[in-house]
Amino acid sequence: MIRNSKGFTLIELLIVVAIIGIIAAIAVPGLLRARMSGNEASAIGSLRAVNSSQLNYNVNCANNSGNAPSLANLVTPPLGGGQPFLSPDLDDTLGPPVKSGFTVTYTGTNPVVSALATCNGAAAGTVLADYLAVADPTAWGTSGNRHFGTSEAQTIFQEMTNAPITAISAAGVPVPATATPIK
């Protein structure tokens, strides 16, 4: 009796599945590292956007008297019309925004008491002399391996350990002191 052997044998199929598994095992860690690098680049971009919008806000909305009291104030357009100073995806009205695996938080200090009301409705005296914006990974080691922070001095710092940046002094020294500026 003649057998008509069309198709693949079980051994051939197992070899193909094993090869695909080996290729996947090699590729997946690289893809995860690339995703983490992309998340970190997005966090740096978000902090640069905060710095840029604060400068624009100070000059064009706060009469050179200081910085916005919140990210929500930066995403509010001027009362006379126009574009907001910051993208709405960083609005902190409902809590700290999460963007690309990083939580962006903003705190301000030292209200400028003599400041007038701003062009987008911030009350007189709510403009701030100092601010700290930080971007922390939502899952350390998964969404990012670095913490980032910036202040009114416009320098962005990175911390390579799992220790968030909690302050940047007027002299430009970050806390923790092991944080380094990004070039």
Task: Tell me the role of every PLM-derived stretch.
Residues A49-R146, T150-A153, M160, V175-K183:
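Extracellular/periplasmic head regions of type IV pilus-like filament subunits
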Residues G30-L47:
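Aliphatic-rich helix starts adjacent to a transmembrane/signal segment
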Residues A25, E40, N56:
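Functionally critical, cavity-lining and gating residues within the transmembrane helices
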Residues A163-T166:
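A short acidic/small-residue loop/turn micro-motif
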Residues R3-L31:
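N-terminal single-pass transmembrane signal-anchor helix
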